[in-house]
Amino acid sequence: MYDRHEVSVKVALYSSDGKRTLLMRHWGDAGFGLPGGHIDAGEMPDEALERELREELGITIDATPADFYVRDPYDTTAKNHKIILGYTATIDGDIELPDQACDGSEAGPVWLTRAELRLLTKSRQATGIFC
């Protein structure tokens, strides 16, 4: 049994042409993930997603609510049970992404093609392809 349940929101953001997905690069070797984050006390999931995207990317979107729900697959021994509410959205136009180091030393958003996503799922060492 878990001591606590943590709920967060994540969104799969697609480019308007459907060829790219926006991921957040984590610091150093921590890999990549979907934009989003924890739901604060008193927040509804949609409000949390709106706040997280404003904080992380400076954008507002219309997301399709809760397309998927998952338990954190990386946390099998923790006392906390993490539930992720998933959303999807398409970004009309493009968003301005900050310049980042190609060595993975900087965190932030990156656009990835399907081929890059496939390579990333095969090898967590694939950070050089994103420059």
Question: What residue ranges belong to the model's regions?
Answer:
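Unchanged
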Residues: 39-63, 71-126
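A short beta-strand-loop micro-motif that forms or neighbors metal/cofactor-
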Residues: 128-131
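Short, acidic/hydrophobic/Gly-rich beta-strand patch recurrent on exposed beta strands
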Residues: 23-25
